[in-house]
């Protein structure tokens, strides 16, 4: 992660399943400014499809997706 990808806000939705991670991500993004970066941590495998779909639907940029031991990390730029 470079300097421009430092999250302004972090959202932990570990242990929650669809639709909670997407709903909470959308809510958090709605409270952020243009250009801000949100880091989301989730462990629901459905988020691997849901987060890119959400980003496309609401017009934000999915900067990065990583997976480590069943935990997914998404960096989203508003």
Question: Model segments located where?
Answer:
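Amphipathic, hydrophobic secondary-structure cores in small proteins
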Residues: 13-66
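Core SAM-dependent methyltransferase catalytic element
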Residues: 73-78
């Amino acid at each position: 992660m470079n300097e421009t990808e430092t999250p302004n806000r972090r959202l932990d939705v570990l242990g929650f399943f669809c639709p909670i991670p997407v709903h909470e991500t959308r809510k958090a993004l709605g409270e952020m400014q243009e250009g801000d970066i949100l880091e989301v941590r989730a462990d629901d495998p459905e988020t691997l499809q849901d987060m890119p779909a959400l980003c496309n639907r609401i017009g934000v940029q999915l900067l990065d997706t990583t997976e480590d031991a069943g935990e997914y990390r998404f960096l989203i730029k508003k």
